[in-house]
């Protein structure tokens, strides 16, 4: 009995086929296995060839910089480098880290062989006077630009030179209707800005300022874009403070003939700040003072374009009132530089963007006489309603926070505008005379 029990215990202790025993640990297995994998089927050769090709590619192609070389759109007008604006992207304040992360930018140097990542930018009113010059700068920087314009005051001719560029797109659209686009930045310039245009359709003007701004702010909120509103010095009305600083609230007539524009812009500023505070939309506000330059509408009623067109046509220069009203005039290139610095900077604003050089209307007329026709006559007419008596920006804030100030004086910039107007005025006249001659021949035949 005892021996039987011993034998059974002995049988129980014998290993079975299904029993699990761990394999002995091989200390170099994690190293030798990948090496055997690489050595089989000539895999190592392919890896070395790939490394060699990549090294060759990144060695041959030069390292790109963060911004593309700038080409001056005013070179055709004869501006020398010291007289024109020079882009100062490197001198601009760095955008916020949150904004850089959202648009996909990264800190540090750009790797070899890679280019700066261009932004997708929409410019409402981009076929207009200021908007088209802004588009030129953005395209030269390497961005993808979408122009949204209803061509009420804009002209296709202002942006036709970009039609063949795959990074340019133009949409005929009125901003009072919503639009959905995937963009990184929104420059909201769309609105009639001359008395002739906004008095022609005042309801349309205030709708563009209010409803159009609401739609663009809504777009910025949906897609996480940064929004820049181009407001105006008209928010100061007929100012009681001179010069005007951004903290001045203005002296505006809410029921005057200019109110559709003045109050519309004031409301647009209110909406912009409400979206910033309530919906965390990144916004910027620029208050633009009188601007002149190539591509201005010839007969838009603004004083500089009026004087230049009248002098070229040998007509009297019409001065309204006693001519002692003052204005400040900045060249369009200076304004565009200020807008871009504001958009890329860290400060909301508002910022005055204008040239603090102040001229009376009579002084401006004399400068136009000196530039075009010394024999041009000056004709006085009754002043228009609600015409501000003084207008001059205090740009201390822009100097300190944006590092911006205008570079082109009136006597430097006016000849460039005259050259553009001369081509368009006499070109139109030649076309008109040719058409008249053709009509006469057809009638006589």
From Swiss-Prot:
Pfam families associated with the record: GDP_Man_Dehyd
Record-listed substrate binding positions: 258, 290, 303-307, 320-327, 387-391
Cysteines paired by S-S bonds: none
Tissue: Ubiquitous.
Catalytic activity as recorded in UniProt: UDP-alpha-D-glucuronate + H(+) = UDP-alpha-D-xylose + CO2
Transmembrane segments: 44-64
Active-site positions on this chain: 261 (proton acceptor)
Chain positions found as N-acetylalanine: 2
UniProt pathway annotation: Nucleotide-sugar biosynthesis; UDP-alpha-D-xylose biosynthesis; UDP-alpha-D-xylose from UDP-alpha-D-glucuronate: step 1/1
One Gene Ontology molecular-function label: NAD+ binding
Cofactor(s) named in the record: NAD(+)
Function: Catalyzes the NAD-dependent decarboxylation of UDP-glucuronic acid to UDP-xylose. Necessary for the biosynthesis of the core tetrasaccharide in glycosaminoglycan biosynthesis.
UniProt protein name: UDP-glucuronic acid decarboxylase 2
Organism: Arabidopsis thaliana (Mouse-ear cress)
Gene this chain is encoded by: UXS2
